[in-house]
Amino acid sequence: KMKQMFGKAPKVFRNSSLIYNDEIGAMVASMGFKGMLTEGAKHVLGWKSPHYVYHCNMNPNLKLLLRDFKLSDDISLRFSNSEWNEYPLFADKYISWIDAFPQEEQVINIFMELCSLGMSQPLSSNILEFLKALPYCAKEKGITFSTPTEIVTKLKSVSQLDVPYPMSWVDEERDTSCWLGNVMQREAFNKLYSVAE
């Protein structure tokens, strides 16, 4: 449908709440996608950095782009929080944080939902002015922007990423427990799956 309507076929997949595990990655790869966006969860990465391209351990053809949750949440959650120790956040300061990362780190992925603009961050917070200024401040530091498709096309994976259990960008746990964390949720989930079988 996308190809028919827009003349383009998507090459990178983004699941709701960035939910991912190895099995999901294998399914996404089998659908022909070349990359997938997911969370840079510490409990999965361990000592690894989210600033590199990884690949699915069940299909090395699927590259994984991991969200830098701190930098993403600085915009989507904390930007207008006057209690935050970095408030107010200006584009030049934000770009200086990105510029401070080691040169060898391949990519810094900033992912957020559009509902952050206007809901989590009211327009009165000057979020739009911040976003407009970002490319200019980045250009001054020699920092460039790329689409996910450009990244998975240009960059090689440095390693496979093993994710046996689902992870997401939700809550501190960065997993799916918020949806299956109590008896009622699990019962509804199991009923739904029993109907499918």
PLM features per residue range, with description:
Residues 1-17, 96-111:
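CE4/NodB-like, metal-dependent polysaccharide N-deacetylase domain
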Residues 8, 29-50, 54-63:
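Acidic, His- and aromatic-enriched active-site or binding-groove loops in soluble protein domains
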Residues 8-16, 74-89, 118-125:
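The substrate-binding groove and active-site-proximal loops of carbohydrate-active enzymes
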Residues 13-20, 41, 149-152:
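Short, solvent-exposed turn/loop segments enriched in Gly/Ser/Thr/Pro and often Arg
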Residues 17-19, 39-42, 69-71, 114-116:
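Active-site-proximal loop/turn and secondary-structure-junction residues that shape catalytic pockets
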Residues 52-53, 57-62, 66-69, 81-82, ...:
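Active-site and substrate-binding clefts of carbohydrate-active enzymes
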